[in-house]
Amino acid sequence: MPDASQPQGSPLREGPHRIVVVGGGAGGLELATRLGDTLGRRGQAQVTLVDRARSHLWKPLLHEVAAGSLDVDDHELDYLAQAHWHHFTYRYGELVGLDRARKIALLGPTFDEEGRQVTPERAEPYDTLVIAIGSTTNDFGTPGVRDHAIPLETTGQARRFNRRLLNACIRAQTQAEPIAPGQLHVAIIGAGATGTELAAELHRATRQLVAYGMDRIDPERDLRLTLIEAAPRILPALPERLSEAATKLLEGLGVSVMAGTRVSAVTAEGVHLADGRVLSSELVVWSAGVKGPAVLGALDGLELSLIHI
C-alpha cells in the first residue's frame, strides 16, 4: 500500500484536481463520464472511477437476466473501454475505508474465482470524493435468507439464479420419478418493482424454455410462481390503481399473489410464513428490501440515514 504518511491530499500539491467517484452504477458511471468529457478531456481534472465489478449492467434489467430473457454480453458496458472513450481512469477495487485527514480512499485487495489475488490493497488519493456505491440486500435478520435465497443485486446473482432455474428444469425433465410438489416452485419474496417484474418475466421465459423439447414438464401444472409481499398490496410504493392492475395481470398469468403475508424463515424446504404455513419451493428469490452497504458505517464522520441499519 502507498505510504499513507505522505500528505497526498494536501491542497498545496501541483497538478489537476483529483476527482474520485466510488461506485460505477447508473449515477456514478454517468458522473464519471460527464466529468471526463468536460474536465478530464481538457486536463482540468483527473477523474477516476472505482468499482468492484469490471462492467456495468443497468440494474432494472437484472430480472431479465435471471429469467434468461436477456444476453448480458449484449448489454454490459466495460468500464475500461468507457474510461478510454471518455477521458477518465478506471480502478478495479472496493472501498474499505477512508482517511479523511489525508484525503485517501482505501481500496481492499481483489481476488479471482480461484482465490488468487488480482490487486493488492491500495490507497487512492483525492481532492474531491464522490461515494455512489448504491445499496445492498436487506434481509431484516430473517433466518435462512443468506443460505437459501438468492438476491438480485448483481449480474452474478442473476446469472446464478438462471443457472439454477435451468438445472431445475433439466432435472425434472430427466429424472425417473414423478415431479414432486414444490419441485419446480419459484417463490419470490418482495413485490416491489424487481419482484413483480421477475414474476411476469419468469412466466413467459419458463414456458418458452419448456417449449424447447422439455415435453415431460406441464407448465400449467408443474411450474408454479408465488409472489409474497408483507405490505397489504404489491408495488406498495406506487398508486393503488397500478398495484391492482398488476395483481390482476399476474393472477391472470397464473401467478399466486400473496400480499399481507410475512415470511418468518427460509430453509432448504422452502418458505416459512409467519402464520405457520410452509411453501415448498425449489428456488427462492429475496427482493424484499435494501440498505446501505456495511462499509458506510465504518467511514469516520459520515452521517447516516435510517436506511443504513
Protein language model features and the residues they cover:
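Helical element adjacent to the flavin cofactor pocket in flavoenzyme catalytic cores
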Residues: 80-83, 243-257
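FAD-binding core/adjacent interface of flavoenzyme oxidoreductases
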Residues: 2-16, 88-187, 285
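Active-site acidic short loop of glycosyltransferases
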Residues: 126-127, 268, 280-282
